[in-house]
Amino acid sequence: MLMPKRTKYR
């Protein structure tokens, strides 16, 4: 999935 700039993931 496409991850946003700032989330729980790095």
Curated annotation (Swiss-Prot):
Keywords: Ribonucleoprotein, Ribosomal protein, RNA-binding, rRNA-binding, tRNA-binding. GO terms for cellular component: ribonucleoprotein complex; ribosome. One of its GO terms (molecular function) is rRNA binding. Binds 23S rRNA and is also seen to make contacts with the A and possibly P site tRNAs. Belongs to the universal ribosomal protein uL16 family. Part of the 50S ribosomal subunit. This is Large ribosomal subunit protein uL16. It comes from Acholeplasma laidlawii.
